From Swiss-Prot:
Disulfide bonds join C3-C46, C14-C34, C20-C40, C24-C42. SMART domains: Knot1. It comes from Triticum kiharae. One of its GO terms (biological process) is defense response to fungus. Plant defense peptide. Belongs to the DEFL family. This is Defensin Tk-AMP-D5. PROSITE patterns: GAMMA_THIONIN. Keywords: Antimicrobial, Disulfide bond, Fungicide, Plant defense.
């Protein structure tokens, strides 16, 4: 199962999953993706 948490450090509109994921790495998440509302969500297995 995958858990999602909105990124605390990501600024601006999320248009690149890669950008989002690299910010999430600094928040101790293994990855991240943009959602439909252009926000960055960090993901991890839970």
């Amino acid at each position: 199962r995958e858990c999602r948490s909105e990124s605390k450090k990501f600024v601006g509109l999320c248009v690149s999953d890669t950008n989002c994921a690299s910010v999430c790495l600094t928040e101790r998440f293994p990855g991240g993706k943009c959602d439909g509302y252009r926000r960055c969500f960090c993901t991890k297995d839970c």
